[in-house]
Regions:
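NAD(P)H dinucleotide-binding glycine-rich loop of Rossmann-like/cofactor-binding domains
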Residues: 90-153
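Glycine-rich beta-strand-centered segment in the early N-terminal region that forms part
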Residues: 22-40, 51-95
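Rossmann-fold dehydrogenase core element
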Residues: 228-278
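Mid-domain Rossmann-like dinucleotide-binding core that forms the NAD(H)/NADP(H) cofactor-binding site
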Residues: 126-195
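Glycine-rich cofactor phosphate-binding loops and adjacent beta1-alpha1 units
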Residues: 174, 184-249
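C-terminal hydrophobic helical "lid"/dimerization subdomain
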Residues: 1, 260-305
C-alpha cells in the first residue's frame, strides 16, 4: 500500500516520504480500515509517540496521521460493535502507525460509525479537533450556561469547535487570534474577538474558563484573568501558570465512541460546522504538508477519491 513515513526526527515535515508499505493485519480487537480521508496535525512530528513505542523504543520508519474516515475491510478476533463494509471515523493510537496510508490497523473502540450523509473529508476533520473541544469544555472545563469562555486560536480547527460547542452550552465566547482571524472567529460564533498582536489581553476582564492552545506568556497572562472557581484548560503540555483561585488542567485527547457520535450528530443537524482548510491527494501530501503558507483550518489528505 501507499503510505507517508517519517524516519529522521530532526528533518521535521521535510522528512516526510511517500513509499510502499505492507498492508497491516488485524490483531485481537483490531479493525482494518481502508482510509478514504486522513487528518494531519503538524505538531505531531514533535510528539515522542510519533517516533517511539510505549516502551520508548524507536519505531521508525513510522506512519504519522491520527485522524481517519473510511470503510472497515476486516475484523480482528474479539472485535464487536462494527462490521465489514461499515463507514467509520476515528482517532488512531498515538504509538502505532497512523492514517497517512491506504489502510490502517486500529482498535475498534477508537472508531465510531460515520453516517452515510457525512462526507469522508468531513469525518476525517472531526476526531482531534472535535474531541479536544468536547473533552476540554465538558470533562475538564465543566462549562455551564452563563459562563464566559476565552478561546485562544478561535479561527483554528480546535478553536472553532470550542466556540461552537461553548455557545451551544450557553456560554459567552471571547475568541483570540491575529487580525486576519477576526472574521472567521466571529463567523463561527465568537461574540467578541481580541487581536493578540494589537489588543490588550487584560482588557477582557474576568472569565470563567480559558481554553489555551498557545501556552507560554499568553497562558500566564490568561491565568490571571480567571475568576474564583474558574478553570484554565491547556492542550499544549504541562500548565506553566495557574489561576490564583481556580483550577488548571492539561490533557491529551482520547478516542471516545459516544462523544464522536455526539459530535457527528451535531454536524448532521447543522449545529456544528467543520473548519476545513487545505485538501490534497496522498500523492501530493508531502508537498501540501510542507507548505510555508499559514494554515487556515484543518488539513485533510484525500487518500481514496
Amino acid at each position: 500500500m501507499k503510505a507517508i513515513v517519517v524516519i529522521d526526527h530532526a528533518a521535521g515535515s521535510a522528512g516526510l516520504t511517500l513509499t510502499d508499505r505492507r498492508e497491516p493485519s488485524a490483531a485481537i480487537n483490531d479493525v482494518i480500515v481502508q482510509i478514504h480521508a486522513s487528518g494531519f496535525v503538524p505538531t505531531e512530528l514533535e510528539w515522542s509517540s510519533t517516533w517511539t513505542d510505549r516502551a520508548g523504543r524507536n519505531r521508525t520508519p513510522s506512519i504519522p496521521g491520527h485522524e481517519l474516515a473510511g470503510v472497515v475491510t476486516a475484523l480482528g478476533y474479539g472485535t464487536t460493535g462494527l462490521s465489514v463494509g461499515q463507514r467509520v471515523f476515528g482517532l488512531a493510537d498515538w504509538h502505532r502507525d497512523g492514517t497517512l496510508a491506504e489502510y490502517v490497523a486500529i482498535e475498534a473502540r477508537n472508531l465510531a460509525p460515520l453516517p452515510g450523509d457525512v462526507d469522508f473529508t468531513v469525518g476525517a476533520s472531526l476526531p482531534i479537533s472535535g474531541l479536544t473541544a468536547w473533552q476540554g469544555l465538558f470533562q475538564h472545563g465543566r462549562v455551564q450556561a452563563g459562563h464566559s469562555v476565552l478561546a485562544h486560536g478561535a479561527a483554528g480547527a480546535v478553536g472553532t469547535m470550542v466556540t461552537q460547542l461553548a455557545r451551544e452550552a450557553g456560554a459567552y465566547v471571547i475568541g483570540t487570534g491575529r487580525a486576519a482571524d477576526r472574521e472567521k472567529a466571529l463567523d463561527f460564533g465568537a461574540q467578541e474577538f481580541l487581536d493578540l498582536d494589537n489588543d490588550a489581553l487584560e482588557d477582557v476582564g474576568g472569565v470563567d474558563l480559558v481554553f489555551d492552545v498557545i501556552g507560554g506568556d499568553v497562558q500566564k497572562r490568561s491565568a490571571a484573568l480567571i475568576r474564583g472557581g474558574g478553570t484554565l484548560v491547556s492542550v499544549v503540555g504541562p500548565v506553566e501558570a495557574r489561576p490564583a483561585d481556580g483550577r488548571a488542567v492539561d490533557f491529551v485527547v482520547e478516542a471516545d465512541r459516544a462523544q464522536m457520535g455526539e459530535i457527528v450528530q451535531r454536524v448532521r443537524d447543522g449545529r456544528l460546522r467543520t473548519n476545513l482548510g487545505t485538501t490534497a491527494s496522498l500523492d501530493d501530501a508531502v508537498a501540501a504538508l510542507n507548505s510555508t503558507e499559514r494554515r487556515k483550518g484543518k488539513t485533510i489528505i484525500i487518500v481514496r477519491p
